[in-house]
Amino acid sequence: MRKLINLIALLIMASSVTWAQDKKSFTLEDLMPGGNNYYNLLPQNLYGLQWWGDVCINADIEEVKTIQPANGKENVLITLQEVNELLANKELGKINHFRNASFPYAEKMMLVNTTSNKVLIDLTKKEIIWSQPLSPKAANQDWNKESRSLAYTLDNNLFVTTADGKTQQVTDEPKGIVCGQSVHRQEFGISKGTFWSPKGNLLAFYRMDESMVTDYPQVNTSTRIATLEPDKYPMAGMTSHKVSASTIRRPKKQFI
């Protein structure tokens, strides 16, 4: 009996020594950003996760995959090569990744943007079912999934392209009056300038008159030679811009 007790004690001591030998003290290389081993110790995150109805989607660089919540198992829906082949067959451009892909319709389709088109792809049939021409310079894009109409701005004016590809210029304002963009320098939680109704048949937008505001001499340093690009900026105590809101009924240019 005594020998058995001694054997158990010996095993406990041996395991304690082994555990102590396995302990590792962290160094600055492990703990500091930029350290040789820092990024190896970070938890791995998944970026680009979206919900496709009740299905979790991982849209990364090369593939669009579904993820099973119970076990994390992934299933490839479509690849970048397959999508670009579909786009090339219809001369709709190409995409370089799926980071900007969206899934507006539950468990049905994927929306991707090329430089020249918005494209809906049926992921089950792996075919293009709809496309919409897009101006390469279109900014502040706001797409409605019900009407498939796209509101966007070119310079300071607002345009709408309907689902059948017809484009309507909503405003024709001179320089100094901005339509369809965020106002009040994005203060008060304002981050956009167009707002679709749920059915996509009405579009509300901001109109900002800043023609009375003095120019602030901003310089664009990204050009080969720095260029002057004045910005309307009301200094303290000086005249500020005026903002109003309008609503247009699609598809006719009817203001309300």
Located regions from the model:
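Beta-propeller folds
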Residues: 20-256
